[in-house]
Amino acid sequence: MRQTISTMAASSKTNMMQIMRGCICYTTVYRIWTNKNRTEGLTALCYLLFRNTCGQYSAQYSTVNLSGKSMAKLWGLNPDMITDTMLAGMTNSASVTGLWPSCPSDQHMLWKALLTTTLAKLRHRLGYHAYYTPVTIYIDSQTGLVTACEPVSGERSIPRPGLLKTDGMISVEESCLISTAMKHAEGAPLAHIKLSALKRTRQIPEFDMRIEIQTKEERFLREYKKVNSPYKKFKCDNNSNTIFKVVDNTLVLDHLQPPVRALSLVPTSFDCLVTTPAEFSLVALLATYAKWHEKLYSCDNESTNILVPILMYIGPETNPRGEDVDYSCIIGFPGWPIVKSSTANQTAIKDAIDAYVDTDGLWPLAGPRTFHLLAPWSPENHPFPMIDTSHILSVHSTDIRHKAADEWTTGRITCILRDPTLIENAAIAKFDFSAFFATLYLGLFPTHSRLHDVVKARLKREKPWLKRPILEFGGLLKKLNEDVYQSIISIGNHISIEVEATASSLMFAPCTYIKDGMWGTFMDKSKNVPRPPMDDERDFNILRNACAESANNFAATIGLQFPDEILLDLRLEGIYTHAMSWNANCYWLWNKSNHHKDFVGFPNQPRFASYAKHGLSTLLEKICISNDTDESLQTVREKTHEVFEELLSIAFDHRSDVSFWSCPTELYDDTQYIAALGMKAAARFDTSGFNRETVQTVTADGKIVSVTCSLFEGEIILPAIDCIDYMKPILAAFSRLLINVLSSKWDNVNRDDFTFDIESYRFMFINNK
């Protein structure tokens, strides 16, 4: 009898649930409101784009509670300035139809924090692992809401990208731009000023624009033309009307309130849209989406109980300080993501799609917080390490080693070569641990499966785009959880000492050790001099394996538990025959046989610096193959002057080339360019939030002025480029490093012979047009 009742109860529960199998392709926030929960006073209705096992898409919904103050702490915002009521009001305003949908200046970080934190809480609550992974979802038949997800075994689904092209340009009145810019006391990028000006108008502007979506199955094209009045829409031949469909879901969000209707545009043949800067107009996209949003939801929503979704854009353009990465994030409507590729190159597109899939769309939107948000625990509940690292390290280390490890609070950096030193005809090698600090983190927290996946990819040398988010993950850890950060740093320092000891036992002298890697040379024990170069890699690989084994043995001894396929992986980055060390952060390695080199610490910007770096490297090679006679020194001196004259000639030939002298900048104040650009400013507004290059110029009265040249298209007329002042610090470094090398080999070096007075050539560059 008891079994019958249990079976009936299970059957009744199943009947109340709709079960679907497939994968989640995308999630976003549909609406947010306050609730009566004291600790998590916000409820978010989230939209899920779901693809079933037959490849058909559906709109699904779920709710999750969150706290504005917890969100603020995670994102480094002031929790005392953020209330749940304020956030609910902000999101409600974003659901009003007929308004320009870009994020206001003071809400950029709030929207970014709110979206990413909500989606992290949603994934944690429902229990799905990642986008495109096989899952069973359970939908409450009474409420229409997804209540749980259950991961199932099987291959990860492949994204179905569509290609997005948008075209259109809004001309904003110069006076409007200037008045908007005046509100930014610290300045702002032109892209931000323009979007802010459009936001002030509140209405959707009318202008000629075009949107095209192309998939393997169909092509959707709409052109909107401002031809007199009213505003007209044109369809084109060979055009699909079925690329997405309107779906009406009835949801019960509160049993004390009537059901609501959630309308959504559900795609039929794509689950993400890929675009490139060359084929993308942000203003055209936002205007198009705003018009669709207005048309779909502009009916009498109260009588029809339609819940209007948020429509809000955040990107580098909405950040008043700009950003150094490009992305486009539309929150809420229409219900699919935009993936931006840097170029139309297939590799770049693949990397962009991979980044979307591997991070659930959080990279680069969430920046360093990406893999913190993808952890299997709630963002505000980071667990404690499984081991007491401080105690265990003190037990498994001598007092001297423990003290040495504790001295380096951001990672151990040592260099045994106290003075600039040239090493010639030796068995030199460079080693690095791959994803070192992220791997150590996994040793403390092996259940972080999303970090596990990407670290495993990096250990296999896959997906080079992962290098930055993994690196930034470790960098942010200090702010989010300093105790865990210091534990990892301390473990890393102890491992570096273990590796050095192992290397020394094999007669390899680490010249420089920097946090997660080293370079050095094999020594001849009997003569205490570097061993000559070796013909094969056998001894280097023996060394690599021994050092890696000692690192992993130490990790195991102190209790680190790495997940499957993860171990500390020491790479042999290169074998060399010559080296020049100036300090721990500046060195040159060269292989005489294959001419492979690694030059660290010399400036790379502007492009002139890369020519100087190449010239210096050429001289270093010349020095290494020369003997230490006075005749050889004279030959090097002559060659040095040839290199200098060649650099001077290259600089002169490029004296008017903006791209040759421009450098990336972190300055984002473009207010002074509004009058200069006038109505033409719109041509570059859409990239000024993230793509920024400046060049130093000299005006007619001798003043140095920095010009953000990336704002202008094609050839631009500038004052004389300040070539000499660009060259001065680069050539000073060139001479200083070169003299150090020469002094390591010859005793009678005349510094003046290798120092260049570039100032005496200023007359060549005064009028460089």
Swiss-Prot record:
<keyword id="KW-1048">Host nucleus</keyword>
<dbReference type="GO" id="GO:0006260">
    <property type="term" value="P:DNA replication"/>
</dbReference>
<dbReference type="GO" id="GO:0019079">
    <property type="term" value="P:viral genome replication"/>
</dbReference>
<comment type="function">
    <text>Component of the helicase/primase complex. Unwinds the DNA at the replication forks and generates single-stranded DNA for both leading and lagging strand synthesis. The primase synthesizes short RNA primers on the lagging strand that the polymerase presumably elongates using dNTPs. The primase-associated factor has no known catalytic activity in the complex and may serve to facilitate the formation of the replisome by directly interacting with the origin-binding protein and the polymerase.</text>
</comment>
<dbReference type="GO" id="GO:0042025">
    <property type="term" value="C:host cell nucleus"/>
</dbReference>
<comment type="similarity">
    <text>Belongs to the herpesviridae HEPA family.</text>
</comment>
<comment type="subunit">
    <text>Associates with the primase and the helicase to form the helicase-primase complex. Interacts with the origin-binding protein. Interacts with the polymerase catalytic subunit.</text>
</comment>
<protein>
    <recommendedName>
        <fullName>DNA helicase/primase complex-associated protein</fullName>
    </recommendedName>
</protein>
<dbReference type="Pfam" id="PF03324">
    <property type="entry name" value="Herpes_HEPA"/>
</dbReference>
<dbReference type="InterPro" id="IPR004996">
    <property type="entry name" value="HSV_HEPA"/>
</dbReference>
<keyword id="KW-0235">DNA replication</keyword>
